[in-house]
Amino acid sequence: MSYSVQNIRNVCLLGHGGNGKTALAESMLYLTGGTVRLGNPADGNTVCDYDPEEIRRQISISTAVAPVEYNGCKINVLDTPGYFDFSGEVIEALQVADAAIIVCSAKAGMSVGAEKAWKLCEQRRLPRLLYISKTDEENSDYNAAFDTLRERFGKNIAPVAAPIWDADKKVIGFIDVLHKRAFEAGPKGERIEIDVPDDKKPVLDELYDALKESVAETSEELMDKYFSGEDFTYAEMIQGLRQGVKDLSLFPVVCGSAVSGLGTRMLLDIIVELLPSPLEGRPLMGENADGEVDEFVPFPGALPAALVWKTVSDQYGKYSFVKVISGNLKPDMQLVNSRTGATEKLGRLYVMKGKKAEEVKELECGDIGAIGKMEKVKTGDTLSDPRKVVKLEPIPFPEPCYSVAVTPKTKGQEDKIAAGLIRLNEEDLTFNWVNNAETRQMVVSGTGDMQMDVILSRLKSRFGVDAELSEPRVPYREKIRKKVEVQGRHKKQTGGHGQFGDVWMRFEPGDTEELQFCEEVVGGAVPKNYFPAVEKGMREAVVHGVLAGYPVVYLKATLYDGSYHPVDSSEMAFKTAVQIAYKTGMPQASPVLLEPIGELKVTIPDSYMGDVIGDLNKRRGRVMGMNPDGEGNQIMEAEVPMAEMGRYAIDLRSMTQGRGSFTFRFVRYEDAPPAVQEKAIEAAKAMQEEAD
C-alpha cells in the first residue's frame, strides 16, 4: 500500500542504550499487525536487531527501519543505537527524520543519552516528544523520572499521559490527558478503557489545565479564548498542540511499557496527530544546479530527488537506503549522482522492515525505502533528475577520535583485511584506515573501542580473516644537537672499473624540518655533476635515523670537500660515500628523539573540570586555557604528547559519563624526556629484530 506525503511520519527513536528503544519499535509493530509475535531484544528475535553482532551483544549497532501502518498513516520508525560508539548511525537517522522520540527509562530517569539526543535535536531544530519507558517494572519511578526531565528540559515539556498505580504501587493503566479517559492494557497489549480512578481525577484536571495553557500560547486566537474562560474543542487542542510541537514551544511527554503494550497505542495516536509530515518537517539544505545554497522541502509534484542516507552491504547484497525528497522514484529511472556527475540507473525498489526487503513499484515523496545493487552510490549521495540536479548538504559524521592497529593473526592476510575494511566502510563512514609505511601498521581510526571490536568480529564472520588489535606505534622523529664534520669514503676495486667516492660532510642542527642540503666545495675537489647524487644519498639516508630508525628532521648537511677518481668515480659511488659519512657522523652529533605533540580541545561540563585536569597532568599535558561555551560547559585547550592519547576517548567518556568530547590535532615535535626516549628506542630495536 502506498501513502501520500501528508500521511507519512518519519520518526527516529533516540536515547541511552538499554532504555527500551528497540522494544518500543517492536511493540508498535506487534500492536499494528506488523509482526505476529512480540520480539524481545534479550531473546535475539526482534525486527530491528537482526545483525548477528546485535543478537550476540543484545544491543543495537545499526539504525533499522520499522514501517508501522496505523490509522491510515505510515510511520517509518528509525530505531537508532544508544551506545555512543555508534553515533554515526544516529546522525544518519536524524538527517532524514522529521521528528524524534527521546526514550527515557522510568527506572533511570534523566540519562546522558537523553541529554545528547536533546542537544542533537536542538541543533537541527527537530520537533520531538519524550517517552518514559518501563513504567511497570520493579523499582521504576515515573514521577521522579518526569521531574528530572522537567528540571533538565524546562517547563515546555507537557505530559499528555500519566500512569495509574494500584494499592501496591504497581502500574495498571494510564490516563489519557487529551481525551480525559483512562485505559489499561489487555493480555495482547490492546487498549481497554476503564473509569478514571477518583484519586486521579484531580491529577487529570491539573494536567489538562496545564495542557490547555500550553495550547493557548500557540496562537492569539486560542489565547483570547483561554482568557475568556471558554473551553477548547478537541480540534483546537490538536491544532494548538500540533503547532506547539512544530515550532518547538511544546514537547509532549508520553509514558508506557513496551512489553505489556501499555501506552503504545496512545503513542501511535500522538505520532499521527501531533508530529509533522515530511511536508511540514525541517527542510534540508543543499545546492541547486547553479551552485547556490537553497532549502529543499519535500514536494510531490516536483522532479524526483532522493538522499542516500544509509548503506547496508553484506554477503547478501547492497542496499542504498533513501528518503525521497521530491517527486517519486520508480525502477529503471535515470538519475544523476551529484557527487560523481554520473547518471545512475535505479535498480529495484524496496521497503525495508529490519532485514526483510519487500519489493515495491514506487517510492512516494517523503517516504523512506531502499534501492538494490547501486554499486557506485555511497552514503550521503544525492540522486536527482538530470533536468534539475540537486546536491544536498553532507551528513555531518563525527570525526574519528580513537585509533588502533589491526594485524592479521596469520601472516599474508593483510590484503584480506583491507578488502574487508573497504566493504565495512561502505556501511560505516565514521571510521577510516591507513597503511602507515613508517610504523608498518594498518591503523584504523573511529569512535571507540566497542566499534573497533565490532569491526574485528565482522572481519572474521563476513570475510573469514582473524585479526587482532594493538596500540598504534607513535611516529617519533630524530634530530641532532651539535655540529660534526666527518669523512665518507667508498673505494672498491674489482677488476676493470672500480668504485670511488670521497666526501667530507658537515652535519649540524637545521632551521627547517625538511633536510637542508648545501655545498661549499671549492677548487673542483668534487665535480658539480656529482652534487645531485650526494644530495639524493642524503635524502635516502635521513629516512632512517641512527637512534631508533625514525626519520631525521631539522638537519643541515653540507658537502664541503672530498676527492674523486677520473675513471672509477660515479654517481652511485658518491651516493654510497655520503651514506657512509651519515652512519659515521650522526652518532657523534648527540642525536635525540622527538615526540609528536598535539593540540587537545576538550568540551566538558564544569563539574568534571578537576578530574579532567588531573588526568591531563598524568598524561604530561599542559593546560593552555579555558573558555565557557555558553551552555554550562568549558572548552579546555591543552598540549599533550601523542603517545599519551591512545585511550583518551575511552577514558574521557568514563570520567564524564559520556558528556565530554574532544578534538586532537598534531602541531609540532619536541624533545622527548629521557625515559620516553629509552622506551621508544628499545621498542624500535625489538620491532627490527622481529622484522629480521
Region spans (language model):
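Structural and coupling elements of P-loop NTPases
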Residues: M1-D692
